[in-house]
Design a protein with these regions (language model features):
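Iron-associated oxidoreductase/ferritin-like identity signal
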Residues: 1-174
């Protein structure tokens, strides 16, 4: 059984993951609208991944005897300046998620909830991977540049990343 404090923090993380899912969905839509099919495919995948992260938390709370709450999603931005802006904002979103997960893990240690702390270690590792992924994309954008055919080349590079990224496991596999 988890404490009410940890339950509340886990539900807050559900909110964070739900927001990230919709945020990436909005970014994907913007990319699609602006002819960036590769970036859109990548961001649709990120949206699905964040939803899976949310459901994993949801199921954990229920299994631990708590009440998982469906997230309320605040308004999602729909307009972005350019592809650089999209990926800078995506990195900031991942950094926010990392901070939230780390705070949650810290609270678990303070509460001596080692089971939930152990559960969260997957998220800690995942957040490291996600931040590195978005930094790599931004590094590629910086190298390629956005002048001339740069945006086209960026879209192709991000499409390759989307193609090579493993599909998130379904909830039955987790």
């Amino acid at each position: 059984m988890i404490s009410k404090k940890i339950e509340a923090l886990l539900n807050k993380q559900i909110q964070q993951e739900g927001y990230a899912s919709y945020y990436y969905l909005g970014m994907a839509s913007w990319c699609d609208f602006n002819g960036l099919e590769g970036c859109a495919k990548f961001l649709y995948g990120q949206s699905e991944e964040e939803r899976d992260h949310m459901l994993k938390l949801f199921n954990y709370i229920v299994e631990a005897g708590g009440q998982a709450l469906a997230p309320e999603i605040k308004k999602i931005p729909k307009d972005f300046k350019n592809v650089v802006n999209v990926f800078n904002l995506a990195l900031k979103q991942e950094q926010s998620n990392t901070k939230s997960i780390n705070n949650l893990a810290d609270a678990c240690l303070k509460e001596k909830d080692y089971s939930t702390f152990n559960f969260l270690q997957w998220y800690v590792a995942e957040q490291h991977e996600e931040e590195m992924l978005f930094k790599m994309i931004l590094d590629k954008i910086a190298i390629i540049g956005t002048e001339g055919q740069g945006v086209y080349l960026i879209d192709n590079e991000v499409a390759k990343i989307a193609q090579n990224k493993p599909t998130p496991p379904s909830q039955e596999q987790q």
